[in-house]
Amino acid sequence: KQKRSVVRPIVADLRKRYTVSAAEVGHLDVHRRTVIGVSAVAADRGHVVDVLDAVERSAAAHPEVELLSVRRRVVSSEDF
């Protein structure tokens, strides 16, 4: 419960502030770790990169959070 009380407000803040999809997607049973997945859709790749940069900064700015790693994948319609 303590973990959820930290993670839920962060996920809700990211969704509201940046209009992205965000959810806790990993390490669900590990007390001191989590994985938060974020996705964004836009016509312009540059805009998606800017939004994801801002989301990363925002998540890292929470004093109760230590960002251990970030993985990013940007997919374009040209990739299909």
Regions from the PLM with identified roles:
Residues 42-80:
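C-terminal structural segments of small proteins and small subunits
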